[in-house]
Amino acid sequence: MTMKLIWDKFYVSIIFVLTCIVLGIILMCTVVGGGNDYSEVNVSEGDSLWALADQYAGKSDMAKADFVSWVEKENNLADGHVEAGESVVIPVHKTKLIKSDSTIQLANQ
């Protein structure tokens, strides 16, 4: 079979498969790039992962133990110890953290 004969017979299928491949690549890039919406917080003196869990676990819809495990895993904290001045990523979407902070700020005015 020549290329012309293959194209004439299967052009709809070829276009469909190529479209699916392109859309799949776009979808994969979108999903991989969308993982950056988690908040980053600075650790203060005397803070621990459990203190961060007390403060933020309610905004993440996770149990405190799950929150601590997630933070340890995502921030590569083998012993679960954090030091003052460190930044850690927490499983709270940036929009949730900003909304709650602005509400508190408005209430204080």
Curated annotation (Swiss-Prot):
GO terms for biological process: division septum assembly; DNA repair; negative regulation of cell division; SOS response. Keywords: Cell cycle, Cell division, Cytoplasm, DNA damage, DNA repair, Septation, SOS response. The keyword Cell cycle applies. Residues 39-90 form the LysM domain. PROSITE patterns: LYSM. Gene3D superfamilies: LysM domain. HAMAP family: YneA. This is Cell division suppressor protein YneA. It comes from Listeria monocytogenes serotype 4a (strain HCC23).
